[in-house]
Amino acid sequence: DWSSDVCSSDLTNIQFISPDAHPQVIAISSALPNEGKTTSAINLALSLTQAGAKVLLIEADLRRPKIPIYLEMSSFSQGLSNLISGPKKLTAASVNKVLHNYENTGLKVLLSGEVPPNPSELLSSKRFEELIEILRKQYDYVLIDCPPLLPVSDTAIISTKTDGCILVVHAGSTKKPHFVGSRDAISAVGSVILGVIINKIPMNSLEYEYGYRYGYPRYYGANYRPYARRKLEENQYAPNSDVLSRQALDDAFVHIKGQRFKEELKRKESK
């Protein structure tokens, strides 16, 4: 479907960010709740699976898990929290026991498990790192649906164990200070933002200059300017000056690209 096609294109773009290797373990988050991070994570996971990749989707929002609701999966007692907090040594076999197949799609899902009293402590533990390393050896992509960035520190913690983070932005709703705060939270822990998905743009405004009609338009510095994005530039979806604009995204990406350039320069100088 259209959302899967565009999400597949998003991951293709992200794959070319690094000249050495494609991002394999990817955190997906947003500034605040209800901005579309979980549906974006699911669509990305399904599109990659349909393209032939071996994909695992992890529900890491241990406070308000939504994946079982969206995928209409039964709630299972065993999941991520149990693996991290359990006393037994983590192995590929023990991890595989708590994974679930999503229908006949080929997508594997690791649900959140029992709600723990200390999510941040679990996610910052050595066992979570060990789990990620086990999964790296088994899957082409591990997509992690994370909590929103601003209310809790969980996603910043998770992002340090990944190859980077995708931020999901709610068009015409996400505030500039919230986006910048999310960006800074990721940068502060030494992680990187791989890309931004602009989500929830009205379907009747998806009119591209090249004649393509897609859902979920997104900003990756592409050479097209959809009608909806022109409206964002004109602030027609932004009655308040606080609402995230095209210029705010441009400024954010200048900052992110400059940071990556400095990191790459340091890496080359250390060789």
Where in the sequence are the language-model features?
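P-loop NTP-binding module
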Residues: D1-K271
